[in-house]
Structure formats: structure tokens, C-alpha cells
Amino acid sequence: MLKKFIEDIEHHFEPGGKHEKWFALYEAAATLFYTPGLVTKRSSHVRDSVDLKRIMIMVWFAVFPAMFWGMYNAGGQAIAALNHMYAGDQLATVIAGNWHYWLTEMLGGTIGAEAGVGSMMLLGATYFLPIYATVFIVGGFWEVLFCMVRKHEVNEGFFVTSILFALIVPPTLPLWQAALGITFGVVVAKEIFGGTGRNFLNPALAGRAFLFFAYPAQISGDVVWTAADGFSGATALSQWAHGGSGALINNITGAPITWMDAFIGNIPGSIGEVSTLALMIGAAMIVYMRIASWRIIAGVMIGMIAVSTLFNVIGSDTNPMFNMPWHWHLVLGGFAFGMFFMATDPVSASFTNSGKWWYGILIGAMCVMIRVVNPAYPEGMMLAILFANLFAPLFDHVVIEKNIKRRLARYGK
């Protein structure tokens, strides 16, 4: 019945129809439920029914474990901090002055010390969902606008860009900054260069980089990671950068942060970056379906392990980051998220198999170098991936030229 309705109204959106200019929106909605009706005129090159939309939706689903854990963790961190700082009437006053808090209680949750998993998820959702909705609406507007101007269908890559961007920002990010960031990512880093398939930079990371340099106070520092009014606490990566492994403590309880705490995600940070375990679950899904390249992931790990081990051997009495072992680099900051979901972006990464190895190795090595050597910015994954994006075409060019020369030497005579 739904398919018949879609087919009955299709002629209104085709060239000459009364809704011709809205074809991009119609096509996006129709292909959300059914595969396109287009067929090839000559020998078909289609191997199966999985198209771009299905691939992007699978990536969208793959980040759900990290997204749900991120909402739970953001809410849990905020509730613990609030109950640590306030009590009684003072806590009630704080709740009444923040719409996230009173909305959580209005929906049946609680901000008190007795809060359960549901209340933590609910509070985290009041922070994440508005950011995601803002990013989706604003970014979707630009996507549809460019599609209407260029007269082609809406590219499904924005489904992934929108949720990835929303997951790599702090839960306290102002909504207007989220709108600015995704605007920069979609318009400047993607559409100006031709749209999906033609951008050489990762749009989500480009948008975050714009916010980092334009509004550093809302995207970094000690006050943006825990959604509790009046609370300040550094991320685990910043703690290590300033005091080594001994400085890793829970900002609320003062208890030491263990490797397992960081691996599971019981630490403050960007919404989707805190749980390496949840990220691994999603990554296993897209690697199994061959959407993400295992070569890139392996290359990132090789580069990270090699350079971090080198710094461990060199050592330093003044810079604690020299002594961070590779297994801590893996679980702190945005390394795991970047390795699994950003570095493997098929558009901005290298295409050739050999190029993927070198592309991944460069990312892992650059991430550790930025973390260790840069005194002002302990995180390095974002800049490392954007830097490697610039070199991805060069890697492919070198690999292709080398293959051509080898074949000419073999068969040219």
C-alpha cells in the first residue's frame, strides 16, 4: 500500500510535474523505504541490493551502542556531580534553574542520589537529542538546498555526518554553536567541493575543528565535559598530560581511574567518545559488512603503538605524556572513535589497499605525536585525521604510479 502511494505521486515530482523542484525530498523519502527503480541499460555492475543509503544507515546504526552509552554516561556524571555539590533546597534551586534538570524530572526521572539508569539516560538524552536535532535540521537544510540547486537527489551521507558530529562534541555545547559547526562541515568541507564522494576532508571533523579554533572555551577546557552547573573537571587525558598516571582520578569521588573504567567509559568526555567497548561493538559490525576498512584500522593501531613505544623508550622527566603506554592511548580521548568511524570514511581516506595502510599508520603516528609534543592540546586524533586526509590522494597516486611502472617493466617489452 505504501509502495503504491509512492508510485502514484511520483509523476508530480518528475520533470514537468507541479512539484518538480521538490524531487530531491521525494526521492530521499521514497528510497528510505524502497530501493531505487532505476536499472542499467547495458551489462549491470550491481553486485547486490545494498546501495549507498543502506550502507549509510548501517553506519548510522553502528554508532548506536556508543550513542546510548554516551547518554547514560553524560547523565550519570551530571547527577553524581550535582549530588556531590548540592543537597536539599540548594539542589532543588539548581534543578529549577536548568531546563535539562526540570525536564528530566517532569518526564518521570530524578536528579537525586537515588537516580537509576533510566534517570541517567533521560538526563543524558536532554543534552544529546537537542544537539543531534539541531545538527540534523541545520545540516539537512544545507544538504537539500544544494541538491535542489544542482538538481540531483539527496545524498544519504548526511545521515552519518550528522550523528558523528553530534557524538564528538561535549554534552554542554550551545545549540547555536552546533548549528555553526555543522554548517561549516557541510557547506565548506563538503558541498563546495561537489558534495558526497568529492570532499577530501571529513565533514564532521572539519566542523569540529572549526568550533575548536573559533570557540575553544565551549569545546575544550575543564568545564564543558560534565553537564552539572558550577562543576569543573578535566578529562582523563588532560589529567595524564599534567600529572602522569598518578593524576588519573575521578573528578567527583577522588577515586583512581583504572584502565577498565576508561575502556568501559566511566569517564567524562565527548558524548560518543568515552566508551571504547561500545565503539568496538559498532566497529565490528561495519568491518564485518566491509563498510569500514580493516587495513586502515590496523594501520592506525600500528602507527600508534610504534610511536608511543618510541616515546616510552625515550622518556622524559618533564612531560608525563612521554610515558603513556599504547593501551592507555587507545582508551583515552577520541582515539577509538576516530580510528573506527572517522579514519575509515571511504570518501576522504585512501582508496588503494597499500595506500590505506600508510594512511592509517600516518594517523596513528600523528595522533601520538600531537598528544605528546603539543603542550597546549593533549588530544590529537582530530588534527591527525584531517592532516592524513590531505595526504590520502598522494598515497593513492604513489601506489598507482608504482603499480604502473611495475607492470610496464613486466609486460612493456
From Swiss-Prot:
Catalysed reactions, semicolon-separated: a ubiquinone + n Na(+)(in) + NADH + H(+) = a ubiquinol + n Na(+)(out) + NAD(+)
HAMAP family the UniProt entry points to: NqrB
Record-annotated membrane-spanning stretches: 55-75, 128-148, 163-183, 267-287, 296-316, 324-344, 357-377, 380-400
Broad class of the protein's primary localization: membrane
Enzyme Commission no: 7.2.1.1
Name by which UniProt lists this protein: Na(+)-translocating NADH-quinone reductase subunit B
Single GO biological process annotation from the record: respiratory electron transport chain
Pfam families: NQR2_RnfD_RnfE
Top-level taxon of origin: Bacteria
Modified residues (FMN phosphoryl threonine): T235
Gene Ontology MF annotations: FMN binding; oxidoreductase activity, acting on NAD(P)H, quinone or similar compound as acceptor
Its membrane topology: Multi-pass membrane protein
Known partners and oligomeric status: Composed of six subunits; NqrA, NqrB, NqrC, NqrD, NqrE and NqrF.
Places the protein is found: Cell inner membrane
InterPro entries xrefs: NqrB, NqrB/RnfD
